[in-house]
From Swiss-Prot:
Entry GO MF terms: NAD binding; NADP binding; oxidoreductase activity
GO biological process: organic acid catabolic process
Signal peptide per UniProt: none
Residues at the catalytic site: K172
Key words of the record: NAD, Oxidoreductase
UniProt organism field: Shewanella frigidimarina (strain NCIMB 400)
Entry EC no(s): 1.1.-.-
Name of this chain's protein: Uncharacterized oxidoreductase Sfri_1503
Pfam families: NAD_binding_11 (PF14833), NAD_binding_2 (PF03446)
The keyword NAD is annotated on this UniProt entry: yes
């Protein structure tokens, strides 16, 4: 059993922290909105703290899962941040999808304090978090990875070390770049099927048995065909992730024309008041263009 803190109880962090309790770990949570932490304690047990610093005190491992770079800096380095509560020898594991730069920044800040850092963004969405089946992409030191991997197994089906600090975030960027292209292709395929008078559900059932198969196809085609877009990762968050990837691409010289185009398409869906629709709502944009 490990003594851990979990900072950030959003749609991902809430069930992830719950899985840690279910696996027998001693868990203390903190959330910016205190009512959410109270709800979590009522549902899972464990303890809650009033500040990130308080949550981190005495813990072997501290997990964070917050919104963006600035949120991460605040909960780690702020006046009441985690860094002021962690002890030497502890490990900070960040599940936020953030920039590789902020991962390196935090690692460099806490290294002189003998606190280890692993960037560890996840993939699998809310369903993956609830079912304990996330994929975790990690950057950092092998020994620290080996220490935290058994704990992370509470909510993951795959956790791999990809390289030094920052490698986890860079891998998550690859993940989001790939998803953008796949979802746009699926949206175009369904749009074409509808325009051609085909039964889209039957079409997907057939082609998903062949080379076109993908996770997005298997999990999103029915809701897309029905025009329902509240079953997955919100566009606002996807645009944040693509923005991070496109910024990194400008620095490393990568050319991402499809990702940049899909990001623009998502901005058009936002203009349709679809900010909280999931990423499969690219089909809604195509349907609107036909009407």
């Amino acid at each position: 059993m490990a003594k851990v803190a979990f900072i950030g109880l959003g749609v991902m962090g809430f069930p992830m922290a719950g899985h840690l309790v279910k696996q027998g770990h001693d868990v203390t949570v903190y959330n910016r909105t205190g009512a959410k932490a109270t709800q979590w304690v009522e549902q899972y047990g464990g303890k809650k703290a009033d500040t990130p610093k308080d949550a981190a005190q005495g813990q072997d491992i501290v997990f964070t899962c917050v919104g963006n770079d600035d949120d991460l800096r605040q909960v780690v380095l702020g006046e009441h941040g985690i860094v002021h509560g962690m002890h030497a020898g502890a490990i900070l594991v960040d599940h936020t999808t953030a920039s590789a730069d902020v991962a390196r920044e935090i690692a460099a800040y806490i290294e002189p304090l003998n606190i280890a850092f692993l960037d560890a963004p996840v993939s699998g969405g809310q369903a993956g978090a609830e079912n304990g089946a996330l994929t975790v992409m990690m950057g950092g030191d092998q020994a620290h990875f080996d220490t935290v991997k058994p704990v992370i197994s509470a909510y993951s089906r795959c956790a791999e070390l990809l390289g030094p600090v920052g490698a986890g975030q860079l891998t998550k960027m690859v993940n989001q770049i790939c998803i953008a292209g796949v979802v746009q292709g699926l949206a175009e395929g369904l749009h074409f099927a509808k325009s051609a008078g085909l039964d889209g559900l039957k079409v997907i059932e057939v082609i998903s048995k062949g080379a076109a198969q993908s996770w997005q196809m298997e999990n999103r085609y029915k809701t897309m065909w029905q025009g329902q877009y509240d079953f997955g990762f919100a566009i606002d968050w996807m645009r944040k992730d693509l923005g991070i990837a496109l910024d990194e691409a400008r620095r490393n010289g990568s050319h991402l024309p499809v990702a940049a185009l899909v990001d623009q398409f998502y901005s058009e869906v936002q203009a349709m008041k679809g900010n909280r629709w999931d990423t499969s709502s690219l089909l809604a944009r195509l349907e609107k263009s036909r009407s």
